[in-house]
């Protein structure tokens, strides 16, 4: 058994139900688990850290990323594009990725997250070029090398340009191929035990790049295996128009009809929900990953986070992909989220502490 003692912490921000902020306190851990907090705890442990000059808070949890995009960040030709044009341009680069690109991009992106206080990374990987190998296995190996908790997704796309989607043919798969590999990934890598460092979610890319059948089967399979569901939703007005044109309903109604609401589901972005839809998210416990920097860069809009929090919608914080953020610092995201909503909502905006709680406990939920 390994033990850790944080001795005489100046300030401990717990983010617990009572919002306790403690001073001059010790924290004692065994095998990575906090066992007790208080004054004058055991004086010895395998590792003792003098916390006299430190503030301590829970590790940040990143709820949406595209680590593979780390190798395509800061490209001048896409800096002023909005989402659909941005995607179609970058797919021509992303269709060439392989296992080594994934390894290096994952190490770089997760390393940057760790550097800025993030201890858990969820990644939404949905680009699987033919012959690229076991890309999620590569990601889990990179996470283990760094020591970060990894929540990876078996993403997917089955609609290419010929089907009215955005990606090229070479990066989409059939529903049957996706389902078979989803089972493989879950059985090979998902660890549901408490404290697990490795979990899997199913995450079709978006309602404009996958078929209703893929969404339906993914929801059924996820619940058979007890894994969570994730996708992009209500990120742009273009998406809203696409859904109304092709399916005759707004995005959330479409997803709900396919089984995509509930406490095991969370959506990235969630910018363009109306009042009724926000209430439905709260009623069903469906979560939202808030990505303020990406939303600003791609001119997608501002998520209605103050209203979500007031209604009880589960909200976490996320950096989104490095190609739409040009970085992987969740601490920067936290500061920008605070400032953005101060500008947009004034006194109704979440406080700095509420944003920290969103990036820790809210994201973990």
Residue ranges and their predicted role:
Residues 71-102, 131, 159-175, 237-262, ...:
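Active-site gating loops and adjacent loop-to-helix segments of metal-dependent hydrolytic enzymes
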Residues 73-124, 129-149, 179-195:
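Alpha-helical scaffold segments that flank or form the walls of functional sites
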Residues 8-12, 106-113, 287, 295-297, ...:
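C-terminal helical cap
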Residues 147, 222-228, 260-263, 280-289, ...:
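Glycine-enriched alpha-helix->loop->beta-strand junction motifs that scaffold or abut catalytic
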Residues 131-270:
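Metal-coordinating catalytic core of metallo-dependent amide/deamination hydrolases
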Residues 1-43, 54-55:
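N-terminal metal-binding scaffold of metallo-dependent hydrolase/deaminase domains
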Residues 257-264, 306-365:
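His/Asp/Glu-enriched, well-ordered alpha-helical/loop segment
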């Amino acid at each position: 058994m390994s033990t850790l003692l944080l001795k005489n912490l100046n300030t401990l921000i717990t983010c617990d139900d009572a919002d306790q902020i403690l001073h001059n306190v010790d924290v004692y851990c065994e095998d990575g688990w906090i066992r007790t907090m208080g004054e004058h705890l055991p004086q010895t442990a395998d590792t003792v850290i003098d916390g006299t000059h430190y503030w301590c808070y829970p590790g940040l949890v990143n709820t949406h990323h595209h680590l593979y995009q780390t190798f395509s960040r800061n490209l001048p030709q896409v800096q002023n594009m909005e989402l659909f044009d941005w995607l179609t341009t970058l797919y021509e680069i992303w269709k060439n990725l392989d296992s080594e690109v994934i390894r290096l991009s994952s190490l770089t992106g997760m390393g940057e997250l760790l550097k800025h206080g993030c201890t858990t990374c969820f990644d939404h990987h949905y680009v699987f070029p033919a012959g690229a190998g076991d890309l999620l296995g590569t990601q889990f190996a990179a996470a283990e090398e760094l020591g970060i908790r990894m929540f990876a997704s078996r993403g997917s796309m089955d609609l290419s340009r010929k089907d009215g989607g955005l990606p090229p043919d070479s990066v989409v798969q059939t529903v049957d191929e996706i389902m078979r590999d989803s089972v493989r990934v879950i059985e090979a890598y998902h660890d549901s035990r408490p404290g697990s460092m490795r979990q899997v979610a199913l995450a079709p890319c978006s309602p404009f790049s996958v078929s209703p059948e893929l969404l339906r089967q993914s929801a059924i399979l996820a619940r058979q295996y007890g894994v969570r569901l994730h996708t992009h939703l209500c990120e742009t007005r273009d998406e809203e128009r696409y859904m109304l044109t092709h399916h005759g309903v707004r995005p959330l109604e479409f997803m709900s009809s396919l089984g995509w609401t509930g406490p095991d589901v969370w959506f990235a972005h969630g910018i363009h929900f109306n009042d009724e839809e926000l209430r439905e998210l709260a009623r069903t416990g469906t979560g939202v990953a808030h990505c303020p920097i990406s939303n600003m860069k791609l001119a997608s809009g501002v998520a209605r986070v103050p209203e979500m929090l007031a209604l009880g919608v589960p909200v976490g914080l996320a950096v989104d992909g490095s190609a739409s953020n040009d970085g992987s610092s969740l601490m920067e995201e936290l500061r920008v989220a605070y400032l953005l909503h101060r500008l947009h909502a004034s006194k109704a905006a979440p406080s700095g502490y509420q944003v920290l709680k969103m990036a820790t406990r809210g994201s973990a939920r």
